[in-house]
Amino acid sequence: MSAQDVRSILSLPPSTPLPTLSSSKKVPVPRKPDGITRELYALIGDNAPSLADAQASLAAVKYREKPALKGKKVHWEWTKFTPAARRDNPVRLGHWARITDSDPNDSVEYFGKFNLHGPSVMEYSQFEYDQHLVDPNWTLQETEYLFELLKEYDLRFIVAADRYAYVSPEGEKRKRSVEDMKDRYYTICRRLIRTRTASDPVHQQHLIQAYAFDKAREIKRKQYASDLFHLTPAEIAEEEALYVEITRMQQNERRFRADRDELMRSVMGLDSGLVEVDQSAMENAIGVDKNKKKRKAEDESAAPSPAPTPKKPAPNAGFDNSRCIYHLPTPSNANSLTSHLSQKHPPHQQAFLRGSRLPLPKPTAAGRITDLLAELGLSANRLVMPTRQNMEVFEGLLNAAAALVEMRRQVNRVEQELRVVRMQKEGLMPVTTNPSARVKGEAGVVTGGSEATVKAVTPVKEC
């Protein structure tokens, strides 16, 4: 038995400490690859891609296999079918159809369920045609042919015009344009809507507007579009030059208008251009002396009247039209032109502050209103936030304060009259014809019976 075994049996510590394993493992340092200098590898660090790692990552990719669809067996066959739109004239056609195991004999046309009719065509009776729908350019047979054609092609006027081949009973072939067909159909629709009784007049008016059609305007529009489409390069260049010139003229007009507004604003304080200006204000601004004008008018009235001026010849209409001369109509009175201008251009209003348009109280009540607002902690001069809502509320407050001051004045007046009447009733004051006489601050002598009593009447301050 060795000494180490004895120490182990007696649970004694070993004489020398046992060697302990290091907890930190050495991290393997990657070796510098061949062909790269040490300085370049130090700059790259651990960001250098490894071809082996890339190949290993690509090898680890597992592509997903194509899923195996567990569906029913489907195959295509050439089958015969009858078009759903030709029930009256059945035609057997063939097409490739997908046949499933569940329904191998299914030969119904798939697109038959989509064969729906388009917009409905209005119908009329013989009585309605005789009363409201007669047109000298259209016969009854041709109108019926038109409606049948539109019903067959679902109101597609372009297709109907291409298929239009009406032959009159006399053997005459007639060709109608798209505008003729539209004009005839929409005219009949409008007449039927007007003549038939409608439960909702508003809906009836909407329908009439929906069927509105102007044949002349449509023809003119198509002609204009055709002319634009067939323009030559020279005409296109000319139109572009005209457009550039018009744009330049509009820019100059805007610039001239801005300069004119700026001039009017700087000279007279106006915010717009040519407006109707008060003549008296213009005279005051220019500084015309009215006394001089009055004196001049008196001198002219005192002077002898001049000889009557020869009457101008009447204007010749042909001469004026050839030289593009236009004569303004002479107003019957001086105010006719002014009234005409005022209708086109309303009187000018300069920019103003909302606070300046508040109604001012009466001078006699202004002080009392100011005192009343001061008691409420408000200022009668200005608001901190003079917005539109605040100005409206402040205006209402001023009106209420004025009404309150007026009410207080009336109450004081009535109380004073009652006081005077009571004193007259008690015999302290002589009866006067005016019971509303104010009692001043002097002493009054009142006769009561055989004694004379001097009473001092307390003055009452009138509000």
From Swiss-Prot:
GO cellular component annotations of the record: NuA4 histone acetyltransferase complex; Swr1 complex
Keyword DNA damage attributed: yes
GO biological process terms on file: chromatin remodeling; DNA repair; negative regulation of transcription by RNA polymerase II
A family per Pfam: SANT_DAMP1_like
Region (Disordered): 1-32, 285-359
InterPro entries listed in its UniProt record: DAMP1_SANT-like, Swc4/Dmap1
Keyword Zinc: no
PANTHER family: DNA METHYLTRANSFERASE 1-ASSOCIATED PROTEIN 1, DNA METHYLTRANSFERASE 1-ASSOCIATED PROTEIN 1 FAMILY MEMBER
Domain SANT positions: 130-189
A single GO molecular function term of this UniProt record: transcription corepressor activity
Segments of skewed composition (Polar residues): 330-341
Function: Component of the SWR1 complex which mediates the ATP-dependent exchange of histone H2A for the H2A variant HZT1 leading to transcriptional regulation of selected genes by chromatin remodeling. Component of the NuA4 histone acetyltransferase complex which is involved in transcriptional activation of selected genes principally by acetylation of nucleosomal histone H4 and H2A. The NuA4 complex is also involved in DNA repair.
Sorted UniProt keywords: Activator, Chromatin regulator, DNA damage, DNA repair, Nucleus, Transcription, Transcription regulation
Annotated family: Belongs to the SWC4 family.
Chief localisation class: nucleus
Subunit structure, as described in the record: Component of the SWR1 chromatin-remodeling complex and of the NuA4 histone acetyltransferase complex.
Name this protein carries in UniProt: SWR1-complex protein 4
Subcellular location: Nucleus
